[in-house]
Each structure stands twice: as structure tokens, then as C-alpha cells.
Amino acid sequence: MEILCEDNTSLSSIPNSLMQVDGDSGLYRNDFNSRDANSSDASNWTIDGENRTNLSFEGYLPPTCLSILHLQEKNWSALLTAVVIILTIAGNILVIMAVSLEKKLQNATNYFLMSLAIADMLLGFLVMPVSMLTILYGYRWPLPSKLCAVWIYLDVLFSTASIMHLCAISLDRYVAIQNPIHHSRFNSRTKAFLKIIAVWTISVGVSMPIPVFGLQDDSKVFKQGSCLLADDNFVLIGSFVAFFIPLTIMVITYFLTIKSLQKEATLCVSDLSTRAKLASFSFLPQSSLSSEKLFQRSIHREPGSYTGRRTMQSISNEQKACKVLGIVFFLFVVMWCPFFITNIMAVICKESCNEHVIGALLNVFVWIGYLSSAVNPLVYTLFNKTYRSAFSRYIQCQYKENRKPLQLILVNTIPALAYKSSQLQAGQNKDSKEDAEPTDNDCSMVTLGKQQSEETCTDNINTVNEKVSCV
């Protein structure tokens, strides 16, 4: 079977020659003139360890054919990475729309999640496609060399922003549990946006040295024709500052938050049981108390019980939110830890470790880390009803929640029913007043209150002039 290349020329009809792949530029060139080569010549692969790879075999393979064969071998990898890119961009756009349009989701934690979705979406737009392109070109940089430092800068920026957002969310939840009054007072939308700006500022500061030094010295961002960080000091410092230190803070504050929630729930349950015992305790039987005292006691009892129910509800909501955030934290740590651990191992055991194995692991682990940006919207969909309903409506191009017809029927019918019942009751009262005759027992028939009975008795005494005691 012949492979046809450019200009419809088959491999068997082209003479042999010796091709050289330049390791610095990634370009192909001929070392021999095709006129001097015999069609029966054949030679073998020879590899120069530093800069070039000499390629020759039976049947001359021009550069375009080599590229086509190389791309065909990478089709499956490109397909998988393309699926990850599409899921990342589409899912995070849905998260941004949900927080922007749904009033139920407009709080401090969801603002952080929206900013996190923006970072993940930009990672899918600007970083992942270029990384997929390097896979197709055998992990060699196919773009101008000046763009390498910019691409690494964006990669580090958005990855650092993701871990910083999760760290800030963990700290914010812990402060909200420990000091809810202070947190609710200073947790306005403006304060939340200021915190988000601080997170992005820290992320920019951590990643800014890459373009500053990389644009001046290509050796810091190029290694054997591949675009990657070649400065060991920056790899070590950047890994700890951008990942391990925020990770430690995030894990500690998250477990402290869970512990505080359990303590609050225990105290709330004990407080509710104490209130119930005090409310049911009385020296006198309930039948011996007047209706006025019973009414006052019930009024004093209800606010406390309502407050207890509201506290339990808020604790339950916090526990559900911490569960969702805990899943997000766990997935982020599991997916990014292999890359950063391997990255540090590549620096520490540079001489003892196999460089090719470490490089292959890093190429796989970085895409596992990218996958965490696509997983977050799926977590929100599975564990949050508001996100789930919003996503389903947005996919159907319905950007506003439709009100249920039952609610409209209730609003329209209840006032009419209330009006009819009030008119009927008024008519019955009027008929009863017309049929009633004044007797001596008019004073004893009044049961609506002491003041009203006294006024009715006074009117009857003035009109009838009977000697009836109304006390």
C-alpha cells in the first residue's frame, strides 16, 4: 500500500535521500542532492544526541509526509484532549452564567466559584489548545519562540489562580463559622470582589517572573526544543508558593471548618432540648391558667423555637456547602498533586532519575491537572439543585426561570374566596342582629373582652333604665 503525499507523489517513485531534523528549529532539510542518490540506496536511523536526528530509509519521505504520519499517530491523543477542552470551556461558561443570572446563587462563596470558573475557562481557551498542538508536533514548540514564555506564564497564572481561589474559599468559610456576625457585616458584594481581586493579584505576582526572565533568556523556557521551565530554582520555589503552601492552608482550614460545624450542631441540639424542657415546665396546671396568660406564654415560646429551627437550618446548609466544596478540594488535590510531586522529583533526582520517564509522566500528569478544570461544573451539577436546574434551562436557551401555573392560580383565587367568605359572615351577623331581641342577658352574652362588655352594658342601662348589674 502506497502513501500519497504532496503533489500526488508516491513514496516508491521518489529516490532515497538522507533527511535531517534540526532539533533547534524543528525544520527538515536535505543533506544530499537527490540527483546524486541512487534509487536503490538505503540507510538506517542514526541519532545525534544533542541537536539532530538523521533519517533515511527505503523510499524518500519528504517533510510533509513525515508530518502527516506523525499527526496520524497522535489522532487519539488529540481527540481526548479536544474533548477535555470542550468540556472545560462549555461547563465553566454555564457556571458563570448561573452565578450572574440566578439570584439564589449570588453570595460570596459563589462569587469565588464564578471567578474560579473564569480562570478555568481562560485555561481552556488560551493554554489547552496550544498544549494539544505541542502533542501533535511531538512535544516540540511549533510557534515563535517569544510566545513560549507567554504561554508558560498563562499556564502558571491560571493554575495558580485555581488553587488560590480554593484556598480563599476555605478561609472565608472558616471565618464565617467562627465569627458569623462579623462575617455577615463585612461580607458584602464589594468585599467579595475585593477578595477576588486580591487572589488574582497574588496569582499574577507568582507567575510574573516567567515572562520577565523568559523573554530575555530562551534557555530558561526551552529545553531540547520543548517549551517548558528549565530553571530549577523557579520550579522548586514556584511549586511550593503556588501549590503546596496554599494546599496546606486549604486542608487545615477545611478540617477546622468541619470540626466547628460539628460543635455548633451539638450545641444547637442541646440548646433546643433545654428550651423544650423549660417551655413545658410550670408550677400550675395549664387548665388553671387564664387564656391571657396562656397566650402570652405561647408568644414568648415561639420566637425561641423559630430561632432554633433557623439555626439548625443554617448549620445544615453550611454542611451541604462544605460537602460540595470538599469534593472540589479533593478532586483538585488528587489531580494536581502527581504533577507537582513529579515536577519536584525531576529537579531533586535529576542525575539518578530517568529523564525520559520523568518527562513522559509530566506530559500525562499535566493533562490530568487540566481535567480538574472540566470536573468542577460536573460536581456542581450533581450536588447542587440550583446549579442543576439552571444548567438544564441554559442548555434549552431558557435564561429565566418560568413560574409555575399553580402559583398564579393561588394568587388570583385566594383573594376572591376570602372576599366571598367575609361577605357571607357579615350577612350572617347582620341577620342575627335583626332577629335578636334585647333582654336582661345582653351583658352576659358579650365574650370578646372586658372593655367591650362594659361599654355594651353601659349603653343598655342608659336606654332601658333597668337596674342590672353588669359586673
UniProtKB/Swiss-Prot annotation:
Stretches assigned to the Cytoplasmic side: 98-111, 172-191, 259-322, 383-471
Domain of life: Eukaryota
GO CC entries: axon; caveola; cytoplasmic vesicle; dendrite; G protein-coupled serotonin receptor complex; presynapse
Location of the motif DRY motif: 172-174
Task performed by this protein: G-protein coupled receptor for 5-hydroxytryptamine (serotonin). Also functions as a receptor for various drugs and psychoactive substances, including mescaline, psilocybin, 1-(2,5-dimethoxy-4-iodophenyl)-2-aminopropane (DOI) and lysergic acid diethylamide (LSD). Ligand binding causes a conformation change that triggers signaling via guanine nucleotide-binding proteins (G proteins) and modulates the activity of downstream effectors.
Assembly notes: Interacts (via C-terminus) with MPDZ and PATJ. May interact (via C-terminus) with MPP3, PRDX6, DLG4, DLG1, CASK, APBA1 and MAGI2. Interacts with GRM2 and DRD2; this may affect signaling.
Name under which the protein is recorded: 5-hydroxytryptamine receptor 2A
